Amino acid sequence: MQFQGSLVALVTPMQPDGSLDYDAYRSLIDWHVAEGTDGLVVVGTTGESPSVSMEEHAELIRVAVEHAAGRIPVIAGVGANSTDEAIHLARHAKAVGAQAGLSVVPYYNKPNQEGIYRHFRAVAEAVDLPTVLYNVPGRTVADMSNDTVLRLAEVPGIIGIKEATGDIARGALLLREAPAGFQVFSGDDPTAAALILLGARGNISVTANVAPRLMHELCTAARGGDVPRTRELNARLARLNKALFIEANPIPVKWALAQMGHTALGYRLPMVELSEQYHSLVRTALQEVGLL
C-alpha cells in the first residue's frame, strides 16, 4: 500500500459538552475529499485518541472508513501504550476496511529501544494490516532511534513512518538509509516542505485540517521538485503552521475550525479551549491565508 501527498491528521469533532459529533465528522471528510486531501489519518494525536473510550475509538475508525467509501484512503490511529490494546485496535481497523494503521511509540511507560522494536513487531505479526510507525517524542517521551526504525523497516507489514521530531538532519539520514519502498512522511508542518523535497512521500498534517487545498498544493509542488512554488506556499503557510501549535495540539486547530464554521467548539478534559490571549494570533493567521 502506497500513500503520498497531504494526509490530514483529522480532528475528532465534539459538542461543547464533550459528546462526539459524528455529523460534523462526516462533513469534514466530505470537505477534505472536495478540497483534494490525499488521505485521512483518524483518531491519532490530533484526533484526541487519549480522550476517547476504546469503544468510541473503534467507532470513529468504522465511521471514517464507511463514510470515505473508497473516495479517499483511511489510515486508522491504532497506537496504544499497551501492546495488547494496539493489536486489538489494529485488528478492528483491518476488519472494518482501513487501508493502514498509524501506530505511535508507546507513551508514558518509556520502553527502551528493544522494547519499542518488540512492541511494533508484535503488532505487525499479529495483524495483516500495513503499519505506519509514528515517532513523536515530544508527546511520548520515549524516542525511537533511526537504528530501531531501520530494524523495523525489515519487518513484513511495516511500510513507513510518520517522522514528527522536526529534525531535518535526522529525517534526511533516515531517507538515505531506509530500504527502497519504505515510506517516510513528515509529521511536522513547519518542516514538512523541506523533508518532502529531500524525498519524503508527504505530510501527515495538522494544518491541513483548516487549509486542506493549500497543504495539498504544497505537498504536490514539493514532491514534483518545484522549489519556487514550494517556497511560495511554505512562506504563505508559515505563520499558520506556527499559530496552530501556540498551545498543545489540537487546542488551536479545533478553535480555528470552529471560527471557520466547520465544527462546534468542544473538547474533553484535560484539553480545554484556546487561551483568550492567543485568539487574535490564530485569527490573524487564518485571515492571512484567506480562511476567514
UniProtKB/Swiss-Prot annotation:
Q: Which keywords does the record carry?
A: Amino-acid biosynthesis, Cytoplasm, Diaminopimelate biosynthesis, Lyase, Lysine biosynthesis, Schiff base
What's one GO BP annotation on this UniProt entry?
lysine biosynthetic process via diaminopimelate
Tell me the pathway: Amino-acid biosynthesis; L-lysine biosynthesis via DAP pathway; (S)-tetrahydrodipicolinate from L-aspartate: step 3/4
| GO terms, molecular function | 4-hydroxy-tetrahydrodipicolinate synthase activity
Q: Looking at its record, which EC class is this enzyme?
A: lyase
Quote the EC number.
Answer: 4.3.3.7
Site positions for Part of a proton relay during catalysis, renumbered to this chain? 45, 108
Q: Which domain of life is it from?
A: Bacteria
Q: Where is the catalytic site?
A: 134 (proton donor/acceptor), 162 (schiff-base intermediate with substrate)
Localisation: Cytoplasm
* Binding locations of pyruvate: 46, 204
Gene Ontology CC annotation, any one: cytosol
Q: Which family does it belong to?
A: Belongs to the DapA family.
* HAMAP family per record: DapA
PANTHER family for this protein: 4-HYDROXY-2-OXOGLUTARATE ALDOLASE, MITOCHONDRIAL, DIHYDRODIPICOLINATE SYNTHASE
Role description: Catalyzes the condensation of (S)-aspartate-beta-semialdehyde [(S)-ASA] and pyruvate to 4-hydroxy-tetrahydrodipicolinate (HTPA).
**Its quaternary structure?**
Homotetramer; dimer of dimers.
Q: What is this protein called?
A: 4-hydroxy-tetrahydrodipicolinate synthase
Give the organism's phylogenetic lineage.
Bacteria, Pseudomonadati, Pseudomonadota, Betaproteobacteria, Burkholderiales
